[in-house]
Each structure stands twice: as C-alpha cells, then as structure tokens.
Amino acid sequence: MTFLQYFKTDGIRGKVGVNPITPDFLLKLGWSIGIVLGKNKTQKIIIGRDTRISGTMLQSILEFGILSTGVSTLLAGCMPTSAISYFTKSLNASAGIVISGSHNPFYDNGIKIFYKNGVKLTKEIEFSIEQKVQHTFLYPDYVNFGHSNNILDPESLYIDFCKKNFPKDLNLSKFTIILDCANGATFKIAPKIFEDLGARVITVAINPNGVNINQNSGSTNILMLKKIVLSESADLGLAFDGDGDRVIMVDHLGNQVDGDQIIYIIAKEYLKENKLKGGVVGTSMTNMGVILGLKKLGIPFCPAQIGDRNVYEKIKEKKWILGAEKSGHIVLLDKHSTGDGIIASLQVLLTMINNHMTLYDLSNQIKLFPQVFLNIFLKQDKDFEKDIKIQNILTQYKNILGQNSRVLVRRSGTEPCIRIMVEGEDYLKVYELAQYIGKTIKLL
C-alpha cells in the first residue's frame, strides 16, 4: 500500500468547492465506493449527513455515483455519525457514509465511511477506493441503476438503540442538563433522549440554518455552555460537535471535563462493576495525570496514534473495550462500534447516579498536568521537522520541563495547521515553551 492522497485522519475533508470536495470528485468517489464496497448480497449503502448547507448537494452527487453502479441507497437524513455506524450494521448494509465536516466551520465538509460491520474503513480499503477513483468513470446502463429509499423513522431507531445500552430503570429526573448541540446533527435526537429519561433539559444551539454549525458552540467552543450552566445552576453541561461523535462536559462549577477525564471516570466505574476488560487506549495527547491515575488503579494504558479509528484499532488489537481522545471521542466497544457522544454522556450520568457523586467529584479524583495547545494555521506547508531549533527542543525539552513532561509537534490530519502540545508540572514553563515553539514555526 502506498501514500493515501485523499483519505486523512478521519475520512476525506476540505473546503467545499476546492479539491477534493468538488462535484467531479464526489461523483467518482460515489462510483468508486459502489464498486469497491457495494458488491455483496445486500447491495445497499446508508447515507447520512450533518446540518451544513452543502450537505444535500454533496449527498445528491455522491448518491448518483453510487446508484450508477447498481447499488441502492438508504437515506437517513440529518443524523449523528454514530447513528450511521449503527444503521450500517443493523440494517445489513454494504457500507455507511456520513457527509460531515465534524467540528470544522460550515464552509468545510467531508466524507466518513463505515464498513458493513459499522467500523471505520481500514487504510487498505481506503487505498482501494482511491485507486478506483483514478479510473475513467463508466457511464451506466440505466436499466441497472440502484434504487434510492429513505430509512423509516431513523430518529426513533437510534434513540431506542441508545436507551437499550443502559438499564431500563435509568432515571435522570434529578438532573438539570444543559445540552449544546452545536447546531449540528444531534439537534433533534439528543434533547429527546435526555428528556425521555426524565432530565430537565435546557438546550443551546439547536436551530441549524446551514451556516451556523459549530458557530460559537459545540465541543470546541464551550464558553457559552459554561456561562449557561452557572446561570441556570445546572448539574452539568454536555457539548457535542457538529456530527455528534464527540462530547466535552462542563461540571456544575463551570469547569471543563474533557475526553481524558471522561474515560478515566468510565474506566474506574467499569473496574468497580467488574466490566473492565484489560485497560484503556488513549493517544500521545492523553494527559499524564490520567495515565498515572489509571496506573494507581492497576489499569493498563496503551497509546495509539491520533484519530478515533486508530484508537479503535488499538482497542481491538489489545482485545480491550475502552478508549478515548482528549477531544471527546469516547469509544465504548461493549456498547457501540464507534465513538458516540450521547452514549458516553449517558454512561457518565449513570456513574454519577451509582456513586452519588457530582461530575466535579468524579473528575477531580485525578490531578491533571498543565497542558498548552496551539494551532499554527499555515498558508503553505512548512518543513518544521528539519529545523534545527525545533529538533533541539524536541530532544532536550525534559531539561527545561522535567521528567514528567512531553512536547508534541505534528501536522493536523483535518485542517491546514501544525498542532503543538506541551505538557509538564510547571504551567509557566509549559506556556513559555509552547509560545516559543509556535513563534519559531511561524518564522520558518
């Protein structure tokens, strides 16, 4: 297998109208997906999308390519990414496709693909699709077109699935929950699930207009959520990203609870309930405080490369069931085959009930190390790997920050930027080193 040109950390993503998110490419992509993934007994592919204004247009183009191969489609409409994973498996489809730009602004969009078992494609299958895209598009025999149909009441199907993962007597009536749906794919489903389970729900960002997805809201911008949690004296806040596969939480005091803390809370509960299999998979970004906290509990930790697919693959390799990214991708393989913000939230709420503890109490059982994150957006790529100053930092940072420290500098797989993470025990030193690295990269 050689270098993947289009598929990155989480599918294909980019600005709409700029290669590869163009009509020509998506037509061929749909055709290629139909040929590579659609040829089995069922010959049907699920398609869902988030609330972006470009979603229906891109869906139509992609669907034409798929139908032209003789493969039929089942349209789910606007649904969370994790719902498409569930439908792909439960409806016995050949594949599932999500048209979403995740946490990116509205002018970006992308394609995520699930295999028939509801998990993200392997790199080998992605390569096969890319190879087919290079071929000349063959105009179809119209008699052999696939058929386009809608999934009947997809919201109810997915809501039932989420609920069935938890005890029938789960009662959230003691909680006031602020839900920030980022004007994205969870805007209908999330409020209904939590209300059905008895919670008092106050909603934020549930009025999508096609261009306000993730705008001053969602898992990457929780300032508004923090303010509302405090002003409403709520028990907690939940912020999903645009396609609903991430969640970041806010406790009743307005403190952020990220994916690292969430997976620690869940792992400790699974250990207590004797449900834990092996340990926890994280990434190179997982906070050192969480790793040390898991170690104290006797829970092994294994890092995977960045990306929820990489986390999933490492969990399967280790034959474990838990994994997470700091950004809020929480994988609970005993409940679902992919990251799911709603299911992760319900598990934390169940843990709060079982232990008679607030989210603040649960998340403060570990001491997080100071971390500083910077995104350096670039107009053109910069070869920072060969810069002597950067290399000196990457080899000698422990002399500055101490042994319990880390420095990571990497290219983003989803945006045109360099991501910097500096971690250590002294916040001032961590902050100063992060700023120095950022300035150095900008001057390259």
Curated annotation (Swiss-Prot):
Activated by phosphorylation. One of its GO terms (biological process) is UDP-N-acetylglucosamine biosynthetic process. Keywords: Isomerase, Magnesium, Metal-binding, Phosphoprotein. GO terms for cellular component: cytosol. PROSITE patterns: PGM_PMM (PS00710). The keyword Metal-binding applies. It catalyses: alpha-D-glucosamine 1-phosphate = D-glucosamine 6-phosphate. The keyword Protease does not apply. The active site is at S102 (phosphoserine intermediate). GO terms for molecular function: magnesium ion binding; phosphoglucosamine mutase activity; phosphomannomutase activity. Binds 1 Mg(2+) ion per subunit. Its cofactor is Mg(2+). InterPro entries: A-D-PHexomutase_a/b/a-I, A-D-PHexomutase_a/b/a-I/II/III, A-D-PHexomutase_a/b/a-II, A-D-PHexomutase_a/b/a-III, A-D-PHexomutase_C, A-D-PHexomutase_C_sf, A-D-PHexomutase_CS, Alpha-D-phosphohexomutase_SF. Its EC number is 5.4.2.10. It holds the Pfam family PGM_PMM_III. The modification Phosphoserine is found at S102. Mg(2+) binds at S102, D241, D243, D245. Catalyzes the conversion of glucosamine-6-phosphate to glucosamine-1-phosphate. HAMAP family: GlmM_B. Belongs to the phosphohexose mutase family. PANTHER family: PHOSPHOGLUCOMUTASE (ALPHA-D-GLUCOSE-1,6-BISPHOSPHATE-DEPENDENT), PHOSPHOHEXOSE MUTASE. This is Phosphoglucosamine mutase. It comes from Buchnera aphidicola subsp. Acyrthosiphon pisum (strain APS). The lineage of its organism: Bacteria, Pseudomonadati, Pseudomonadota, Gammaproteobacteria, Enterobacterales.
